[in-house]
Amino acid sequence: MSIDLKNNVAKSAIFQNTVEDFEAFTGQILSSNQLKEFDFSHLNVAIIGTDQETVTHLEKICQQAKFVTVFQITPHFILPHSQIGIHRLITHPLIAKNRRLFNNRVKSILALRFLETQVNETWLKRLLTPNTARSNKTFFKSDSYYTALQRANCKLQTWPIVKVTDTAIYSMDGTQRPVDIIIRTTP
């Protein structure tokens, strides 16, 4: 799908998370690495994409913000930050002897088990379950990510973004989310 611009150059009408996609937005746009010191009090926050910073700070953002919408198309593997279970597994004699056995497959199983124990709602669990067949798996660490996503003021939006206007984000399912600030992860 494309539209013609004035100078006959075709531009994709699909949201690509590039700087041009945010030109109409009048609010503030933050990079995910600017989250630590920012005050989100009484703001409608949109998080576009997922990285270690957004996973780590989502609970803090939810505590301060009026409403948080997390736009995430592809779910990732979330491991507990405390890693008590992982430490026990690593010190097991069979794993300690053959360190190479502790690879992405084992971490994937641990991440899926963590998801299973942390998320109660079946549909949300399905939306957050990553594809275990993917060859390049991304692992993030957080003890509170799943808890934050289940808060009353937080919504996981898995439909693709259609456009960003001056005060809102529209997704493909027709939902309009009013937004005061956008946290953008770099693709």
Regions found by a protein language model. Name each.
Residues 1-5, 39-41, 172-181:
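Core beta-strand elements of the Rossmann-like FAD/NAD(P) dinucleotide-binding domain
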Residues 1-12, 137-138, 145-155, 163-164:
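Feature captures the FAD/FMN-dependent oxidoreductase FAD-binding
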Residues 4, 73, 187:
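Flexible loop residues that form catalytic
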Residues 10-122, 134, 154, 175:
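Rossmann-like dinucleotide-binding core of oxidoreductases
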Residues 26-29, 168-170, 174-187:
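Extended hydrophobic/aromatic segments used for targeting, binding, or gating
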Residues 125-136:
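Helix-loop-beta segment of a Rossmann-like dinucleotide-binding subdomain
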Residues 132, 151-172:
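A conserved short coil-to-beta-strand element within the FAD-binding core of flavoproteins
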Residues 147, 152-158, 177-180, 186:
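Mobile, glycine/GP-rich and aromatic-enriched active-site lid/loop segments adjacent to catalytic centers
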